[in-house]
From Swiss-Prot:
Its main location: cytoplasm. One of its GO terms (molecular function) is ATPase binding. This is ATP-dependent Clp protease proteolytic subunit 1. The lineage of its organism: Bacteria, Pseudomonadati, Pseudomonadota, Betaproteobacteria, Burkholderiales. Its EC number is 3.4.21.92. GO terms for cellular component: cytoplasm; endopeptidase Clp complex. The keyword Hydrolase applies. The gene is clpP1. It catalyses: Hydrolysis of proteins to small peptides in the presence of ATP and magnesium. alpha-casein is the usual test substrate. In the absence of ATP, only oligopeptides shorter than five residues are hydrolyzed (such as succinyl-Leu-Tyr-|-NHMec, and Leu-Tyr-Leu-|-Tyr-Trp, in which cleavage of the -Tyr-|-Leu- and -Tyr-|-Trp bonds also occurs).
Length: 215
């Protein structure tokens, strides 16, 4: 590759990167180009569509090189617990270590996935905001249907509390108390709580974490 430069193909569209080489030009959308650098993004809600794309990207990057780290950038208000757990389980299942970085805002399942990164490799930028709370669900139908859904929400709450406790080093009782209502934190407060390992001011701060330089 001799050179690359960004060009916006249209207002509101994803930028395209044009790479020039001896073989000519090749165009990539910016996210596909960054995927080649083993960078995966979650931007927006956690849902079936975003989860299927992220799971596929993680599996693809593992097949490309099972020994090289993957970087997962998160700016998400959360969303579906089930779809979030699909991403979480895949992160733990694959061989490459996955580092996580919060840019902007991580809440609910977004925060859960932030904590799911490899220990020592979970980061937030200094002005990121991070929020934890208990899962919620709306129930409709007969009384029996509502009861079934309520039991499922309680199961998910207990399961997620246990997993969050394991990822943060906090007790299950602490997690249950602190997630009873929306609980917003600064990046530094999230570090103190155990949701992330470091708050990064600049890329140079990654000097102690060379895995993000090794692409």
């Amino acid at each position: 590759m001799h050179s690359s430069y960004p060009t916006i193909t249209g207002l509101g569209l994803v930028p395209t990167v044009i790479e020039q080489s001896g073989r000519g030009e090749r165009a990539y959308d910016i996210y596909s180009r960054l995927l080649r650098e083993r960078i995966v993004f979650l931007v927006g809600p956690v849902n079936e569509q975003s989860a299927s794309v992220i799971v596929a990207q993680l599996l693809f990057l593992e097949s490309e090189n099972p020994d090289k780290d993957i970087s997962f950038y998160i700016n998400s208000p959360g969303g579906s617990v089930y779809d979030g757990l699909a991403i979480y389980d895949t992160m733990q299942f694959i061989k490459p270590e996955v580092s996580t970085l919060c840019t902007g805002f991580a809440a609910s399942m977004g925060t859960f996935l932030l904590t799911a990164g490899q220990r020592g490799k979970r980061y937030a930028l200094p002005n990121a905001r991070i929020m934890i709370h208990q899962p919620s669900g709306g129930s409709q139908g007969t009384a029996a249907d509502v009861e079934i859904q309520a039991k499922e929400v309680l199961y998910l709450r207990e399961r997620l509390n246990a997993m969050m406790a394991e990822r943060t080093g906090r007790s299950i009782e602490e997690i249950a108390r602190d997630t009873d209502r929306d609980n917003f934190m600064s990046a530094h407060a999230a570090k103190t709580y155990g949701l992330v390992d470091e708050v990064l001011e600049t890329r140079a701060a990654l000097g102690a974490s060379p895995h993000l330089h090794d692409r």
